[in-house]
Amino acid sequence: MLIAAFTVALSGLTYTAPAAWHTRPPASSMRVAEFVVPKAQGDSDNAELIIYYFGAAGGGGAEANVDRWINQVQQPDGSPTKAKARRAERTINGLKVTTVDVSGTYTAEMSPGAAEHYNKPAYRLCAAVVETPQGAYYIKMTGPEKTVAAAQPDYEKFLTSLKFQ
């Protein structure tokens, strides 16, 4: 539910975020915005949504990032995650947006280049590459499957609010 949402501008990219998502200071210079997405009833963890921007030519292409995100999730039965990932391309307010949605055990590095990895079973990753005239923005939401499913309508409204000015 999108109630009392707020609009933010980041170097030309604007979006409207749900009021239920709480902002927090970015943990690194690669992150331009971070949100805590409140946990669903019965879940022990909140989800998080992070927006990354690496400059006009940084961050790699859409497919490389989608593949990297897919590889951050493992299937409990050992089957290939790539076969279960849902990918899509669409245009939102004139911007090319590539999305991926995948569930499983979240095993991303705890920080770039770290030897330690998360081990979060029953997690879901929803991510998007938003291509703008000033370079791509990378949006990634991760959290317990139930929490991310509950946040899905707000996430979709958030994506459709993206504009570049």
PLM region spans:
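Solvent-exposed, acidic/flexible segments
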Residues: 42-44, 58-63, 119-122, 144, ...
